[in-house]
Each structure stands twice: as structure tokens, then as C-alpha cells.
């Protein structure tokens, strides 16, 4: 690849996207170092693999590095970023540029979209692996079956998420480009929906003449750009107008099945062990990719049936005292609606308690109205203060303000809890046997579910009022 650059330093190495690239480079024999603000399961794993991981950001950490890779969360005044640039001869690049370099000698399957990227990437990866293509994979979440978010394969294909959040996905070279949906998101970078659509269109039109776009026809924002797509594309969805159609969708608990039709032919049945109509669409995207690559139908079926999910995507954390605890990464109104609909479909007889941690001030401000109307499938809602994710607070944009907006739109059992600790305290008093509790958000809200399970197990259950013994 780049033989002069043997020591690669990652600023923000603990991020899920950065860590996957770091793991691939370690497996390729490169010397990897990095820094992050705190020790996590991810940083411990990388350290065990041989990476030199530093806690905190200091200028001396970049000494000796041949190239420095920055997470999208790293600002210009970060001490390691500044030090590397002052050194002059050390390239300082963004994550997407390093990912693009890893893809340079591969055929790439890139999965883009506002929602569903991680699950769809995981499904495509699992199907390609089942089909014997042995892909190299970088996913934005830990695949349950593999225990990691990255895998170095020996095949000709690389499967990865294309993160649109800062526009750097335009640096990536797609051979096959999947777009799951386009939504109003990342308004700290994009001006408006038209800007987002235009950027996705540029991404799709980067496909070479021998490539293919795989586009979800259910999404209105994708439909509106189809006339301007210049490259070969196929569509998928529930509609009879889609090239790949999911028909006769059936759900049973956490399982879904459907029949695939394409261009007048019935291809067969697909079963997935991940609930939700949105995941039917995600799996259908994987079917379309696999058919483009001429994989056997049996391998497609087996690969999707074998797929057991991704951490933090409707992840069943456990059950204690007849209280079911689930965690999900959903932090956008569209994602929250889909997840809570799935929760209601899977557990119609349970009271549904949602613990939501808003993520980023800019997102909360831009989508306040949409957030106020996306929690109707919750019986009880706890909202914490906003998880900043390195952003500076915006006056008047708070978790309490969001709670007031949700209440004004008709939610009658809502509790504002300033911290995750206070959310746990309130939850302990509210929870009753038979409840389903789901934690939602891209920050550290998942801890509340784990703490709740530990308390329920240690206390031996809950009393009639819902209080722990």
C-alpha cells in the first residue's frame, strides 16, 4: 500500500469507525498507535492486538508517526492535530481518506444512508462471506457473530459503511453503492435537505461504468433524485415498482420472513432473525447486492438467516424479575419511530418504558419538532440531558426543553432526568414486572439498562409498586 508509512497514528482511535480501520492495519502488519479520552472495550481490544493506545490528547503522542488519521470529532485546535501539522512533513488525513486507501486495490461495496447503514453493511458482509467471497469488512458496530467490527479477508471485495456526516464519503471509491435512505440529518455540516440530496447524488454518480447503485425505492428523498442518477442502478422495496420486492412479509416475535420477487420472477423466501419492517428492507438491499454478484440463492438465504444482529441495534440486553431490557443506538426521530414500532409489534402485551438521551445540540435544535412527535409508541418516557458529543452547548437547547415539547404534543407520562444516574433512580421506582425497557441514544445511555439489570438481579426483583426490594 504505502511502504514509507509504517507507523500510523489515530487521533480518536476509540471511535467505532476509526477502530475498525486501525484493526485492519494491525492485521496487515502496520505499527499502530492512537489516543482517546477514555479507556473502553474498544481501546482495550486494540491494545491487546498490539496498538499503543494513549489516554488523553497530547502533542508528544504523534512523535514518530508517519501519518496521522483524524476522527471526524477532532477539532483544529486538538493538540495532536496541531502538533502533526506543525511537523510539516507528516500527512494529516481524515478517516475516509485512509479507508479509501485500503479500498484502492479492492472492489468495494459501500453502504450509505441516514439510517440502517450498520445493519445493512453487516447483512451484506455476512452474505458475501457465506457465498465464499471472504470480504474485508469495516462496520460501524460490533457484529454479534464475529465479535468485532472489522475483518481482514483474502477476497477481492471490501464492504464498508460510507459515513455521510461530514461529506468525506465522497472520498471513497464505490464499485457498488447502496443507499438505504436520505433524511434531514447532520445539519451541523449540511445546509438543508437539498444539500444532503445533492451530496448523495454525487456519491452515487462516482460509480464506475461496471458498477451498480442499489437504491431503496421506499424513500421519497431517494425517489426525487432518481432522474439525475447517471449510473446503472437497481431499486428495492415493498412497492411493485421496485426491481427487488419484499412480498408477503410475516413477523413472529423477533423473526421476520418474506418472499422476494424480481422482474416478474419469484426468487424464494428470506428469513431474518432481526425484527422490524425497516430490517426487511435492509436485508432486501443485501439480496440485491448478492444477486448483482451472482451469489447462489441458497447462500443468500443462509447468510441472512445466520445474521444474528449488531450490538446496540435492538439488542436484547437481558431479563430480570420479568423486566426485559433492550438497547438501541437510535437517536434520530425516524430511527426512534421505527424502533418503537418494532418494540410495540414484538411485545404488544408489555408496558413500554423508553429512556432517551438526546445526542448533539445541533441535531436537537434542528429536529425539535420531529422529536416531539416520535415517542407515541412509548407508555412511559424518560428524557435525559443532551449528550454533547464534543459540541458546545446552544442557549435554550436542553433536554428539559425537549421534554416540554414532547409533553406539549400529547405525551402524558414523561419524566425529565438531568443525568443518566438520575434516570436510573427514576427508572428503578417506575419499573414493574412485565415491563419492556429500552434505552435509546448514541451516547452512554446504554449503561442505564445494564445498571437496571444488575439492580434487579441483586435485589431479587421488584415489589408491587415497582420499587426494588
Swiss-Prot record:
Question: What's its EC?
Answer: 6.3.2.8
- Recall the GO molecular function terms of this protein's record: ATP binding; UDP-N-acetylmuramate-L-alanine ligase activity
Could you say which residues bind ATP here? 113-119
Catalytically driven reaction(s): UDP-N-acetyl-alpha-D-muramate + L-alanine + ATP = UDP-N-acetyl-alpha-D-muramoyl-L-alanine + ADP + phosphate + H(+)
Q: Name one GO cellular component term.
A: cytoplasm
What the entry lists under InterPro entries is as follows: Mur-like_cat_sf (IPR036565), Mur_ligase_C (IPR004101), Mur_ligase_C_dom_sf (IPR036615), Mur_ligase_cen (IPR013221), Mur_ligase_N (IPR000713), MurCDEF_pg_biosynth (IPR050061), UDP-N-AcMur_Ala_ligase_MurC (IPR005758)
Q: What does this protein do?
A: Cell wall formation.
Xref: NCBIfam families: murC (TIGR01082)
Species in which this protein is naturally found: Syntrophobacter fumaroxidans (strain DSM 10017 / MPOB)
| Family as reported in the entry's similarity comment | Belongs to the MurCDEF family.
Which gene is the coding source of this polypeptide chain? Answer: murC
Query: What Gene Ontology terms for biological process does this UniProt record contain?
Result: cell division; cell wall organization; peptidoglycan biosynthetic process; regulation of cell shape
Give the protein name, as stated in the record.
UDP-N-acetylmuramate--L-alanine ligase
Amino acid at each position: 500500500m504505502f511502504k514509507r508509512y509504517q507507523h500510523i497514528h489515530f487521533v480518536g482511535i476509540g471511535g467505532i469507525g476509526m477502530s475498525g480501520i486501525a484493526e485492519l492495519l494491525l492485521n496487515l502488519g502496520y505499527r499502530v498507535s492512537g489516543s482517546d479520552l477514555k479507556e473502553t472495550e474498544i481501546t482495550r481490544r486494540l491494545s491487546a492486538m498490539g496498538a499503543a493506545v494513549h489516554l488523553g490528547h497530547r502533542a508528544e503522542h504523534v512523535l514518530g508517526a508517519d501519518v496521522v488519521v483524524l476522527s471526524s470529532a477532532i477539532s483544529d485546535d486538538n493538540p495532536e492535530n496541531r502538533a502533526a501539522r506543525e511537523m510539516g512533513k507528516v500527512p494529516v488525513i481524515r478517516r475516509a481518506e485512509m479507508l479509501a486507501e485500503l479500498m484502492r486495490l479492492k472492489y468495494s461495496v459501500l453502504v450509505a444512508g441516514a439510517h440502517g447503514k450498520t445493519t445493512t453493511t453487516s447483512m451484506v458482509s455476512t452474505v458475501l462471506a457465506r457465498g465464499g467471497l471472504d470480504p474485508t469488512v469495516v462496520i460501524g458496530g460490533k457484529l454479534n457473530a464475529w465479535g468485532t467490527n472489522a475483518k481482514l479477508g483474502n477476497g477481492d471485495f471490501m464492504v464498508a459503511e460510507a459515513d455521510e456526516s461530514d461529506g468525506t464519503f465522497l472520498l471513497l471509491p464505490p464499485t457498488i453503492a447502496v443507499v438505504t435512505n436520505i433524511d434531514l440529518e447532520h445539519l451541523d455540516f449540511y445546509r438543508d435537505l437539498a444539500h444532503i440530496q445533492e451530496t448523495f447524488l454525487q456519491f452515487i454518480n462516482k460509480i464506475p461504468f461496471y458498477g451498480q447503485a442499489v437504491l431503496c425505492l421506499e424513500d421519497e428523498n431517494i425517489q426525487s433524485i432518481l432522474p439525475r442518477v447517471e449510473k446503472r442502478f437497481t431499486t428495492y422495496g415493498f412497492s411493485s415498482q421496485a426491481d427487488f420486492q419484499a412480498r408477503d412479509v410475516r413477523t413472529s416475535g423477533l423473526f421476520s420472513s418474506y418472499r422476494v420477487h424480481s422482474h416478474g420472477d419469484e426468487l424464494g423466501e428470506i428469513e431474518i432473525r432481526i425484527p422490524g419492517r425497516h430490517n426487511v428492507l435492509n436485508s432486501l438491499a443485501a439480496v440485491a447486492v448478492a444477486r448483482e454478484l451472482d451469489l447462489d440463492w441458497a447462500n443468500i438465504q443462509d447468510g441472512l438467516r445466520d445474521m444474528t444482529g449488531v450490538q446496540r441495534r435492538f439488542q436484547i440486553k437481558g431479563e430480570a424479575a420479568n423486566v426485559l431490557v433492550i438497547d438501541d443506538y437510535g437517536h434520530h426521530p425516524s430511527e426512534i419511530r421505527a424502533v418503537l414500532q418494532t418494540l410495540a409489534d414484538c411485545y404488544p402485551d408489555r408496558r413500554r418504558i423508553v429512556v432517551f438521551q438526546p445526542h448533539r445540540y445541533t441535531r436537537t435544535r434542528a429536529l425539535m419538532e420531529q422529536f416531539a412527535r416520535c415517542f407515541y409508541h412509548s407508555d412511559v418516557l424518560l428524557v435525559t440531558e443532551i449528550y454533547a458529543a464534543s459540541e458546545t452547548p446552544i442557549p435554550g437547547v436542553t433536554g428539559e426543553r425537549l421534554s416540554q415539547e414532547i409533553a406539549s404534543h400529547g405525551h402524558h407520562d414523561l419524566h425529565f432526568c438531568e443525568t443518566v444516574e438520575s434516570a436510573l433512580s427514576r427508572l428503578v421506582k417506575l419499573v414493574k414486572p412485565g415491563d419492556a425497557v429500552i434505552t435509546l441514544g448514541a451516547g452512554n445511555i446504554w449503561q442505564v439498562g445494564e445498571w437496571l439489570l444488575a439492580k434487579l438481579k441483586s435485589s431479587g426483583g421488584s415489589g408491587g409498586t415497582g420499587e426494588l426490594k
